[in-house]
From Swiss-Prot:
Gene Ontology cellular component list: intermediate filament; nuclear envelope; nuclear lamina; nuclear matrix; nucleoplasm
Start-end of Acidic residues biased regions: 569-583
Start and end residues of each stretch annotated as Head: 2-27
Nuclear localization signal (motif): residue ranges: 414-419
Assembly: Homodimer. Lamin dimers then assemble into dimeric head-to-tail polymers. Ultimately, two head-to-tail polymers assemble laterally into a protofilament with a uniformly shaped rod of 3.5 nm in diameter.
Region (Tail): 380-600
Record-level Gene Ontology MF annotations: structural constituent of cytoskeleton
Low complexity: bias regions: 383-410
Chain spans, region Coil 1B: 75-212
Subcellular location as annotated: Nucleus lamina; Nucleus envelope; Nucleus, Nucleoplasm; Nucleus matrix
Name of the gene encoding the protein in the UniProt record: LMNB2
Post-translational modification: Phosphorylation plays a key role in lamin organization, subcellular localization and nuclear envelope disintegration. Phosphorylation by CDK1 at Ser-16 at the onset of mitosis drives lamin disassembly and nuclear envelope breakdown.
Record protein name field: Lamin-B2
Length: 600
């Protein structure tokens, strides 16, 4: 220990050795008192630190126990829900299997009906083939009949030509008959004229004969009477022969002309009758052939319609079976995907639970290590802890809206940040505060959030750094957000607004996060949207974010208010400043949750 030089009295009188010894002892005692005071202060500070650490450890144990019990209850409820969902899925799967069995039975019935219809179709196709053969045969017969018809028509045409020729011949013969009749009349007239001429000449000849006889009577008195009679007889005979020959020629010519005309007329009539009979028979055969063709055509069209209807029914049954098969395959795939998602979700929850257990175990080990260090120091110093700090925790809850508070506390040479848990409350905030008596002043600022909603859509979360805003559909129905606007105003600054697309729909129970363009998040609708025209939502002291529907009505709002608090402490600046609260941080990426504990 170094000594302090002893000076003389002001008057210059030297001090006695006893006085010097007393002064040295006094100085040494003062130094020892100072060291003792420093030691006592240090011990007091250590005791306060031990008390603070013990309180923190107890609170950490309480928080850890509460968190573990809460997480345990949460996961037990989630596991119960998962088991319930699995049971419902199993029931649904059993129901679907029963339905699949029914559908398989129906499918078998459809297959049997299809086979029956197929057999009927085969029979119908065989019948169609037979009818086609019959149709081809009928077509062949029809072709034959048509050929016969054409030949008969040709014959009829020939007969008509012959009839025309016969009619022409008949007309010619008629004309010839008329001519011959005229000739006969003319000949008869000529014959009559000749007869009259003959009679006249006969009379003339007789008169001449009489005159000649009279003349010869005078001349031939001597002529024999027999010779005169002979000459008269010869002359009469010659005249009679000439008359008979002329009559025979006229009768023969008349008879021949009448026979020729009658024969030609009878031949023409017979040919016309035969042609009429042949044409009538051809018409009857053609009519019968047409009737048979029409009957076969009707039968064929009926069978074709029946076959087409059967094919349409078979096609409809096949399409129905394919549709039902695809439908049940899709349902099974959807159920399998749901079960896979549930398994993945359960595995993720189990992983998070395991991570939380690992964090709890690490915290327990760290707390145990600090407890052992403190107990060892207390035993070494033989000190007993004297708690001199007071910790108060206050919470308020309600049921209509939610709010959160962030408390940041500053002191000389130290800065601590305590973030409070977001609680449900109507215009209230859940905050945690801690106080230690001291003499130095401290300042803090408080961030409080208040949220409310009049419909099913609420502003679930906002980033204090202006990266994103998250909305949630709290109902069990899909909500259309077409042409809705999400607006934000910071203080008295300019209002910014994000407009949803006309066809955007927020699914039931789902959330959507609208990120700024500078956040570096990729656009992945419908759950992640990027505001490409705006880099950030902005930050500031007083932030008001609200959702407006297509009618201009405000349906949800969330406000963030920042306030500064200054406190005076009664301890010296070397004494510790203390504040503690359960921490659930709202800042950062909403897709990840960070939980931790810091031991100051």
């Amino acid at each position: 220990m170094s000594g302090t030089p002893i000076r003389g009295t002001p008057g210059g009188t030297p001090l006695s050795p006893t006085r010097i010894s007393r002064l040295q002892e006094k100085e040494e005692l003062r130094q020892l008192n100072d060291r003792l005071a420093v030691y006592i202060d240090r011990v007091r500070a250590l005791e306060l630190e031990n008390d603070r650490l013990l309180v923190k450890i107890s609170e950490k144990e309480e928080v850890t126990t509460r968190e573990v019990s809460g997480i345990k209850n949460l996961y037990e409820s989630e596991l119960a829900d998962a088991r319930r969902v699995l049971d419902e899925t199993a029931k649904e799967r059993a129901r679907l299997q029963i339905e699949i069995g029914k559908l398989r039975a129906e499918l078998e019935e459809f297959n049997k009906s299809y086979k029956k219809k197929d057999a009927d179709l085969s029979v119908a196709q065989g019948r169609i083939k037979d009818l086609e053969v019959l149709f081809h045969r009928s077509e062949a017969e029809l072709n034959t009949v048509l050929n016969e018809k054409r030949s008969l028509e040709a014959e009829v045409a020939d007969l008509r030509a012959q009839l025309a020729k016969a009619e022409d011949g008949h007309a010619v013969a008629k004309k010839q008959l008329e001519k011959e009749t005229l000739m006969r009349v003319d000949l008869e007239n000529r014959c009559q004229s000749l007869q009259e001429d003959l009679d006249f000449r006969k009379n003339v000849f007789e008169e001449e004969i009489r005159e000649t006889r009279k003349r010869h009577e005078h001349r031939l008195v001597e002529v024999d009477t027999s010779r005169q009679q002979e000459y008269e007889n010869k002359m009469a005979q010659a005249l009679e022969d000439l008359r008979n020959q002329h009559d025979e020629q006229v009768k023969l010519y008349k008879m021949e002309l009448e026979q020729t005309y009658q024969a030609k007329l009878e031949n023409a009539i017979l040919a016309s009758d035969q042609n009429d009979k042949a044409a009538g028979a051809a018409r009857e055969e053609l009519k019968e052939a047409r009737m048979r063709i029409e009957s076969l055509s009707h039968q064929l069209s009926g069978l074709q319609k029946q076959a087409s209807a059967t094919e349409d029914r078979i096609r409809e049954l096949k399409e129905t079976m394919a549709g039902e098969r695809d439908k049940f395959r899709k349902m099974l795939d959807a159920k399998e995907r749901e079960m896979t998602e549930m398994r993945d979700q359960m595995q993720l929850q189990l992983t998070e639970y395991q991570e939380l257990l690992d964090v709890k175990l690490a915290l327990d080990m760290e707390i145990s290590a600090y407890r052992k260090l403190l107990e060892g120091e207390e035993e070494r110093l033989k000190l007993s802890p004297s708690p001199s700090s007071r910790v108060t925790v206050s919470r308020a809850t309600s049921s209509s809206s939610s709010s959160s508070t962030s408390l940041v506390r500053s002191s000389r040479g130290k800065r601590r940040r305590i973030e409070a848990e977001e609680l449900s409350g109507s215009g209230t905030s859940g905050i945690g505060t801690g106080s230690i008596s001291g003499s130095s002043s401290s300042s803090s600022f408080q961030m409080s959030q208040q949220a409310s909603a009049t419909g099913s859509i609420s502003i679930e979360e906002i980033d204090l750094e202006g990266k994103y805003v998250q909305l949630k559909n709290n109902s069990e129905k899909d909500q259309s957000l077409g042409n809705w606007r999400l607006k934000r105003q910071i203080g008295d600054g300019e209002e910014i607004a994000y407009k949803f697309t006309p066809k955007y729909v927020l699914r039931a129970g789902q959330t959507v996060t609208i990120w700024g363009a500078d956040a570096g998040v990729s656009h992945s609708p419908p759950s992640v949207l990027v505001w490409k025209n705006q880099g950030s939502w902005g930050t500031g002291g007083n932030i008001r974010t609200y959702l407006v529907n297509s009618d201009g009505e405000e349906v949800a709002v969330r406000t963030v208010t920042k306030s500064v608090v200054v406190r005076e402490n009664e301890e010296e600046e070397d004494e510790a400043d203390f504040g503690e609260e359960d921490l659930f941080n709202q800042q950062g990426d909403p897709r990840t949750t960070s939980r931790g504990c810091l031991v100051m």
